[in-house]
Amino acid sequence: MKEYKDTLNLNTTTFSMKGNLSVNEPKTYAKWQEQQAFKRMQNRKDNHGDFTLHDGPPYANGHLHLGHALNKILKDIVIKREYFKGNKIYYTPGWDCHGLPIEQQILERLEKEKTSLENPTLFREKCRDHAKKFLEIQKNEFLQLGVLGDFEDPYKTMDFKFEASIYRALVEVAKKGLLKERHKPIYWSYACESALAEAEVEYKMKKSPSIFVAFGLKKESLEKLKVKKASLVIWTTTPWTLYANVAIALKKDALYALTQKGYLVAKVLHEKLAALGVVDSEIAHEFNANDLEYLKATNPLNQRDSLITLGEHVGLEDGTGAVHTAPGHGEEDYYLGLKYNLEVLMSVDEKGCYNEGIIHKKLLDESYLGEHVFKAQKRIIEQLGDSLLLEQEIEHSYPHCWRTHKPVIYRATTQWFILMDEPFIQNDGSQKTLREVALNAIEKVEFVPSSGKNRLKTMIENRPDWCLSRQRKWGVPLAFFIDKRTNKPCFESEVLEHVANLFEKKGCDVWWESSVKDLLPPSYQEDSKHYEKVMHILDVWFDSGSTFKAVLEDYYGEKGQSPSDVILEGSDQHRGWFQSSLLIGCVLNNQAPFKKVITHGFIVDEKGEKMSKSKGNVVSLDNLLKKHGSDVVRLWVAFNDYQNDLRVSQTFFIQTEQHYKKFRNTLKFLLANFSDMDLKDLERSHNFSPLDHFILETLETTSTGVNSAFEEHDFVKGLNILMAFVTNELSGIYLDACKDSLYCDSKNNKKRQAIQMVLLAVASQLCYFLAPILTHTIEEVLEHSQVLCAFLQAKDVFDLKGINILEKLRLKEFKKPENFEAVLALRSAFNEELDRLKKEGVIKNSLECAIEVKEKALRENLVEELLMVSFVGVAKEKISETPAFTLFKAPFYKCPRCWRFKSELENTPCKRCEEVLKER
């Protein structure tokens, strides 16, 4: 029998089924860098508008992990999406270069080398070199993810001009009266020997002693109450702070019960405390808290007086309703102390050990000197003697240092703060506090997800003053001079601008290298002996929080618009970068420095647990890239609901790889089947069939849905819409139905050419929607299709832009076939019956069938195409009957070329195929 395979249009494409991504992507990315692809993107002439994404800086320390990849890939998708829409994009990647983690790395290295480095300038030089090294490492690792940006000129917070910009932002804060030096309790990391800001604290579970202690009322207080004995019972989980107790706070207007044995507790808590055995069960007297105010009790640890006060912070849900108050070790205690003029006792050093203050003020005996507060707690509890009513151990959420992961303490020290509740002058001449301005600014910002707005609002509503000062070396200094004659900082513009100019020319190292005289402007040098330098450095959150100023407003000039259109970071940045940027923006410009905040979740393992080396559940980014390639990693990011935590395992990446293969194989099929088109056919009108109109209308609906989802940055929704179209309507219906025409019709057949135009339109939309995500793959698609490039008028992926399918195909509208849903329903029922007949061995495939349809209104040619049968009508040999249709054996012979049963003679081509063969 004659072979007809060579007469079919079995077109091929050089676009490979296998991407071999891990080998090919690095070559593509190197080419993009060499050709300065990002600059080309910025210089495209058909820009419709501007779009700025301001990069929250990663820390220049260590290699990238999957969390970095998630963040940078999402940003890259957002940026490229805006670019392909036709906007001019601004994106300058940056790095946070100062701070404690780098200091710790250098200190550990020096310790291993058994050397010390007292010279701060040399120490800072080592820190700078470390940051430079990892900045380059991370930059190259980012580029392997297929991300684009101004990586040739990124921002670095350690650049001299950048340091000057950070300092100038600080100066603005000072000039507006919001920067003050205060002696108050703040989070203190004894492991880092430095103050911490709210954003540098993480909460973890910790076991602590839980003790109930009786403070006996003094004789005069007992006489006022007309009782013989009474002891206020306090509850605390920080016994080490009892040495600094100066007061006990009660709940205003609440009733307090005095038991028969003389213990005073809140009445509503008495029953619970009696059940615990803290107090006896019989109540002898009741007192209103207001009548107890200003009475005095005795601290059983050191016999010092403890004033009874009323506090708004006192709750009646737990404890005793009587709160141990040590203004040197608690913020609420401190503010209560201001109200009652309480003494601030704080005798704990930088390392968290008791210092000589405990001896001078007779707070503890000298045996505690130099002992760490947490280690001392056992002895303190023993020393309480009979005053200890109950001791337990509890596990509770406790603040820890985010860098060392060690517990922190509250410790009153002299630090510099940005004040949240100090009114300052607004642009309209009114006065508002920073808290008020920030809360108002939040209302004008869009949040994705929307829950982020309330989260940030709540944090701003409840946050304390911002502790800015750090007792470290690697950072931007709080470069102010204290006038020793007044003990006040010098905020004169001439002095501050002179320092800023020095930083811009020489960097911040000059603050350590130069004398006071050399740092002052000439007009102040004569009085230099009256000034001394502040030697604290700035909280690194101030560095990163002021990046919008340096990148978008001053130093980097044409790097984007301020406020930026979007910032995009992990959800933990509500308490970090989002807050610091918001607060600095509100001080400098009375507005948020961003219009939209997008947040993503964290990377967790397949069980939803946090990844850690100790658990052995870390998935290596480098291994993923080597095994799957960056486009698969990018697709995994986009195909997940990034607003929640992303679960990751090899299983998830294998699933993503299947999605990738579906897109790739579909594109390969499309490319192959329009590869033989004459480019002249792109410029003329075509007569599209009802089936063509169906898929084009579905493509239009799909495009609208994907566009809408992508506009909301809901990439997983958009991709699911796209994948459903590719799987169901395109592959499941249209391509199957068109294969006969594509393979068997003449190359010049008008129907076939119309189908090819449809395939071009589909490929165009797939490229447009997938380009922000699978940029390398779409670049590869265009490299392998001259026809598609001509249709899109694009030589590579960076020429892509949205197209109007109707205009491109010279159509006024898409005309969906009448009764099409009925044909699809018929197709579904037919396929079900076909499966049964195949299993029973009656037939092998649908082409062996003829079908008589009961619903006569259905178009025969559409039924034949969609059901892929050889004949519509009645035939002799019935094989099945259903309420909707009757199936027969096809009444003709199988065509050896197209395999449809349409030949009048055995082993002879059908009429259609004969005509095609004559043309060859």
Swiss-Prot record:
For this protein, the record's Gene3D superfamilies field holds: 1.10.730.20, HUPs, Ile-tRNA synthetase CP2 domain-like
In short, the EC number is 6.1.1.5
Which PROSITE patterns has this protein been placed in?
A: AA_TRNA_LIGASE_I
GO MF, one annotated term = tRNA binding
Any single biological process term in GO:
isoleucyl-tRNA aminoacylation
**Record's keyword annotation contains Zinc:** yes
Cofactor(s) for this UniProt protein? Zn(2+)
Q: Which InterPro entries match?
A: aa-tRNA-synth_I_CS, aa-tRNA-synth_Ia, Anticodon_Ile_BEm, Ile-tRNA-ligase, Ile-tRNA-ligase_type1, Ile-tRNA_ligase, M/V/L/I-tRNA-synth_anticd-bd, Rossmann-like_a/b/a_fold
Q: Residues that bind L-isoleucyl-5'-AMP, according to the entry? A: E569
Which residues are Zn(2+)-binding? Answer: C895, C898, C910, C913
Catalysed conversion reaction: tRNA(Ile) + L-isoleucine + ATP = L-isoleucyl-tRNA(Ile) + AMP + diphosphate
Domain of life here?
Bacteria
Subunit structure comment from the entry: Monomer.
Q: Which family does it belong to?
A: Belongs to the class-I aminoacyl-tRNA synthetase family. IleS type 1 subfamily.
By its UniProt entry, which PANTHER family does this protein fall under? ISOLEUCINE--TRNA LIGASE, MITOCHONDRIAL, SOLEUCYL-TRNA SYNTHETASE
Know the name of this protein? Answer: Isoleucine--tRNA ligase
Question: Which gene is transcribed and translated to give this protein?
Answer: ileS
